[in-house]
Amino acid sequence: MKTKVQLSFMMFVEWFIWGAWFVPLWLWLSKSGFTAGEIGWSYACTAIAAILSPILVGSLTDRFFAAQKVLAVLMFAGAVLMYFAAQQTQFSTFFPLLLAYSLTYMPTIALTNSIAFANVDDVEADFPRIRVMGTIGWIASGLACGFLPQMLGYSDISDTNIPLLMTAASSALLGVFALFLPNTPPKSSGKLDFKVMLGLDALILLRDKNFLVFFFCSFLFAMPLAFYYIFANGYLTEVGMKNATGWMTLGQFSEIFFMLALPFFTKRFGIKKVLLLGLLTAAIRYGFFVYGGAEQYFTYALLFLGILLHGVSYDFYYVTAYIYVDKKAPAHMRTAAQGLITLCCQGFGSLLGYRLGGVMMEKMFAYKEPVNGLTFNWAGMWTFGAIMIAVIAVLFMLFFRESDKEITAIEVVDGDAALTQGEVK
């Protein structure tokens, strides 16, 4: 099997796994009697795990283990944990299992990126074409959990534990497949010490001012972005969109197009402008949600435009961010660097976003009595998110000074960070 085909299938299953349980989880837990706070903590599992595990796994993989073997072990463990999580109906038993599962899954985002980066010739041209299969995998999970069962004459499975069982089976599949991926050996022979164990060696990258600004803005952006993941399904359903779980895959359809176009945008406009465009489209998306609704064609169309812009925003910011990190980090630290950005975005940023969003919805935007059939002031929530992102975009535009034509690579020598000027191929 050709390497690019293998990497593409790896990405497909990797993101099918996450989409299968993450999007419909709210519906199943709500039906099972979990409180809003318990559901919020359940969603926060991925963020907590992203804080604890990816940078550690990345540092160890950079030095001691072949990346594809680590991926296989984590996927097999995740399959077992998710299977047992799907059997639980009480928060006290469900939460620990979901958290343990998340600890096995979140490092694999950085691992799959690193495996792909290590086995392609042209990162900017090849990676988006491989990564787009992850988007297709996420779409496939939405269709499998949303439209497909009803098209086949079955009842809706979005509010059952079947998506979690699909996740377990898919994890086992990727665990087996990972054993046949191209060998991706460690690129460093550094010794095992406490600093490496905690992944603290990757923090040296923050000495570079541009990387620090990028890291800080990525962290801030992850907070309002989390509002979409936890609230969009409930919002779209409450304002009258039928089968919102299925329709939300439109965001991934737009992601396919713009991800394939990403090499053109990065080469034509440079990484800074593409990252900035990702921020701006996210703010516009929330603006559409502020005025969206099902009462007339125009407002209903705004809902779909908002969903479509999610794919644009994700591609232009996060996929470009992965490419930027791979260019910026030295070869022996790239997996740890990918873990660092996962820690920043899916970890601390998302965790704070989930908690901030949950608290604000309960304390500021929850109606005591339904208003026009709505239980929350959704317009207020989306307005807050749009303003946050707009402020982040301004900060990024002012302080991120990386050249559009060449990247300042960070060269780590004897534990110190030195800067090497020149374009990174």
Model-predicted regions and their roles:
Residues 52-66, 149-153, 258-271, 361:
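Helix-to-loop junctions at the C-terminal end of transmembrane segments
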Residues 1-47, 210-249, 318:
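Helix-loop boundary and gating motifs at the non-cytosolic
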Residues 34-45, 128-133, 158-165, 237-256, ...:
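Loop-to-transmembrane helix entry
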Residues 69-83, 273-288:
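Structural signature of the two symmetry-related core transmembrane helices
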Residues 85-86, 171-182, 347, 376-414, ...:
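Multi-pass alpha-helical transporter architecture, strongest
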Residues 12, 81-82, 91-111, 115, ...:
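Hydrophobic core of transmembrane alpha-helices in multi-pass small-molecule transporters
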Residues 147-169, 359-389:
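A membrane-interface helix-boundary motif in multi-pass transporters
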Residues 1, 181-216, 418-422:
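Juxtamembrane intracellular "pre-TM" segments in multi-pass secondary transporters
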